[in-house]
Amino acid sequence: MKSTNAGLLMTMVLAATATGSEDPGRSEVRREGDRATMTWPAAPGESGRLTLDLRPGSPLFERIEILEDASGRAATLAERVEPSTFVVVGSRENPPPIPPEMSVFNVFFDNPAKRPHRAFASTFGGKTLRVLSEGRRGSVAIGPIEVGPFRGELVITTYAGARLVHVEAVVSTLEDRTAYLYDAGLIGREPIGRSLAWVDTEGEIHREPVAPDAPDRSEAVRHRAIVAESGGGSLACFPPPHQYFFPRDDTDNLKTAWHGRGHRGLAPGFGIGIGQHETGGGNFSPWVNAPPGTEQRLGVFYLLSREPAEGAIREALRFTHGDRFPELPGRKVFTSHWHMAFTVEAMRQKAEGIRPLPIPELVEVFKGLGVDAVHAAEFHGDGHPGDPGPIRLPELAAMFEECRRLSDEKLLMIPGEEANLYLGPREPGRNPGHWLAMFPKPVYWTMKRGPGQPFVENDPTYGTVYHVGDTEDMFKLLNQEHGLAWTAHPRIKSSNFAPDIYRDEDFFRGDSWLGAAWKAMPADLSRPRLGERGLDLLDDMSNWGARKILLGEVDTFKLARSHEVYGHMNVNYVRLDRLPRFDEGWQPILDALRAGRFFVTTGEVLIESATIGGSEAGQALKVGKGDRPEVRVELSWTFPLRYAEVVSGDGRGVYRERIDLSDTPPFGRRTLTFRPELEGRTWARFEVWDVATDGAFTQPAWIDRED
C-alpha cells in the first residue's frame, strides 16, 4: 500500500555542524592509457591499490594490492580476476486479497522458484570509465554491463580509512514484474590464492588448499564471509550484512559462500564469492523486487589484509561488532516476534520423562547476539490457541514456566503471542490483519467466550482467567492488565489492509495500541533505506494524528546455533536502567515502548542520544512562529555513513531534510547539530543510513504549535 502522503513528499538538503571523527586521508583515481589505478589510505600505515585493466577481453582487476606505506612494499592479494555478478531472474506475483492500490511488488507470499526462471552471468559490452568521486571516497563507474535483462554499469568505491573495495552492479530492467536474486564474486583463469578459509557454523576456522580444478561448491559459513589466502595476505569477500538477505520465514544457513570452477555453470574459470539460493528458509522464498526502470545495486565487499584469514575475518567482523549488538549505557536490547515453539517442545520433553530439561540453543544464540530481552510469539502454527481453556490454559502455564526457566540476570524471556483475533473489522475480501500482544506479567486468557460465560473468573488452578469473545473484550483485557498490542508486518503478508482498515477504531486510537512493527520487507535493492514500507507507515500514522510508534520485529520461525540469524535481525535499544527479572514483571519495558523511549537499528549504526529542541523521541515540544529548534544527535557507526534525515509532517505532507554524511570514515563517532524547518509541523523524527544500507531511526517527537 502506498503511503497516503506520497504526493506531498518534500526533500531538502540540510547543513549540519559536526564534531568528532578524524580525517583518514584521500582516495585517488588515476588513468594512464588502458589502465586506471585507485589508491586510498586503508589503515594507519597501509594503503590499498586496485589496478584496472580497461582492455576488451581482459579481466578488469589486474591486481588487488595492499601496500606498506613506510617501505612501499606491496602484497598482491589477487590478480587478473573479473568482478562478476550472476542473477537468477523470475517473475513476481502478488496473490489476493490485496488493496487495489497496492503494488504487485509489495509481497511476501510468493515463490518465483516455482515458476520459470533462468540464470545469467554479467558481461562487459565495453569498458568506458567514469570517475564519480575522489576524496574521502573514490568511486568509478565502468560499463556498459549486461546481466540477463539488466543493463547498467559496474561501480567500484573505496573508502578512506577502510580496507574495503565496494563493488556494485548498478543495473536496471524494463521488464515488468521481475523478481530476482544475485551472486557476486571474483573469477580468474587461475585459482585465487593458495588456500581458502571461512568460519564454519560451529564457529571454527576451516581452511583448505585451493583445488584448481574443483567444481563450484557452496559452503555453510558463519559471518557470511569467505577468504582467499595468498603469500602476502588475505582477501575476504562478504555481502552487505542485512540488505543481502531477502525476507524468509526461517533463518536457516543456506550456504551463502561459494568457491570453485564453473559457478552456476556460467563462470569460465575459478572463483570465490557470495551466493543466494532459489528455495529454502520456509514455505515462501520471495526473492528481490526489480520494478521497471529502478537502479538495482547488487553489491559485495572485498576486504584487504596483510594477515592470514583469521585477521581478515576479524577485521570484517568489526563492521558488525562481531555479529553482536553492543551494550549502550542506560539501554537494553529488546527483540520481538519470534515463533520458536519452545513451549510445545518443553511439554513434549516433560511428557517423555526427560529430566532435567535441556536448555534450548535459542538461549545461547540470543546471549551471543547481545540481546537482553526477547518477546516470544508462541502458538503460531503449534499449540491450541483457539481452545476454550482445558488445553490452552496448561499450554499458557507451560509457556510462562519455560520463560521463567530460561530467564536469568542476563536474558529476559517475555511470553507473548501473535493472536490475530477480534481487533480489526472483517470485511469481504479483506483480512483484518495480524497483531501481537504483550502483557507486563503472565496473564491467563482464552480466545473464546461461551454463551453466558463471564469475561473474568477465578480458576482454582490458574487464578484470574479472562475469556475474550469480541473486540470489546480484547480491548478491555489489554486495558485492564496494562498490556500493549500492535500490528505485525503491516501492509504486507496477512496484514495487507492493516492498520489502515482500523485507523479510526477506538482500540487503535487507545493507549493500549502501540502502533506497528518494522522489518526489512519486501526487498528492493534500488532503495537507499531498508523497510520503507514500515517507515512510510510510521509517517502516515503520525500524520493521522495518532501518536503511535514503530518497533523492530524479526518474525521468524525456529532458531539454532547454525542459523544465519544476524543478517535477518534488527533490534530495539530501549531506555532502561536495568533489566527486570522475570518474577518482577517487565512493566518498565512496556512503559518505555509506550513512551517511544527507544530507537530501532540493524546494529551497525547506533543513535546514542537524539533530541529535538531538547525533547527526546516520544516527548512533546513547542515550536513557535519562526522557531528552528536545534536537533542534536550523537552517533557511532562501523561502515561509512551515507546520509541522515530529519523527517517531519504537518498532518498532510511528509518533509525530509537530508544531511550528507559522505565525508565520514569507518568506525566513527560524531555529534551532529542542525536546525531544520519545523514551523507548522506536528511531529519529527531522525534516521541515518550507511553505505551497506544498514541504519537506525528514532520514534517521533510530538510538536505542539505555539501561536
Regions found by a protein language model. Give the residues of each.
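A metal-dependent hydrolase metal-coordination microenvironment
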Residues: 328-482, 487-488, 495-497, 521, ...
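Bacterial N-terminal signal peptides that target proteins for export
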Residues: 1-9
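Beta-strand/loop-rich accessory regions of lumenal/periplasmic or secreted enzymes
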Residues: 29-32, 40-45, 53-292
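Hydrophobic h-region of N-terminal signal peptides that target proteins for export
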Residues: 10-20, 397
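C-terminal functional module detector
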Residues: 67-122, 129, 269-310, 322-325, ...
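Substrate-binding cleft/loops of secretory-pathway carbohydrate-active enzymes
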Residues: 391, 422-441, 493-514, 558-576
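Conserved structural scaffold segments of CAZyme catalytic domains across common CAZy folds
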Residues: 232-236, 244-356, 360, 365, ...
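Domain-core and long-helix interface of multi-subunit machines
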Residues: 455-565, 637-655, 674-682
